[in-house]
Amino acid sequence: AAFDPAVEGVQVKDATYRIYRDTRFSKDKSPYKTWFGVYVCPRGKKSGFSGYYMHVEPDQNHYMLCTGAYCPTAGEIKSVREEIMTEGDAFVEAIEAATGFEVDWSSALKRMPQGWSADDEYSDYYRLRNYILVKMVDKEYFLRPDAIEHAAKDMQCTREFNHSLNRAIEYA
């Protein structure tokens, strides 16, 4: 919250996900999840807003920092696309300012969505279904004594990207 007043006041319970399930009467005592995730965004993880996500999964040696909107609704996607269409330069500048982060193209559409022009300068961004910037990190990143402060410092450069998404999501 130090670098983004929009997430000030978010409680821990509104940013974390449960790991364990009720195993009292089950033979299978394995946890519900084998990873730990924290999602800090305005009004909490269930708000639908874009935010900052930290993922730690030791079993798979999978560690990452993310910023953005994961699984937005159809209306929110349309609103973000309209934001890109009208404020494309600012959107691309926000992505470029996010040093060390890359756009996640893994769930992008193969073709241009219906009703959107492929001739537009920013048309590639219309194909995205999740508007996320990702930074893969290693285990040592989170073993540092100042890991949280370091993660916050890294995510600070993604603030403008988040703000542009949240402007569009709030409008949707």
Please state what every model-predicted region is:
Residues 1, 104-172:
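Long, solvent-exposed, polar/charged low-complexity segments
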Residues 22-85:
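Aromatic- and glycine-enriched beta-alpha-beta binding-site module
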Residues 16, 35, 130:
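A residue-level signal for beta-strand positions that form part of recognition/binding surfaces
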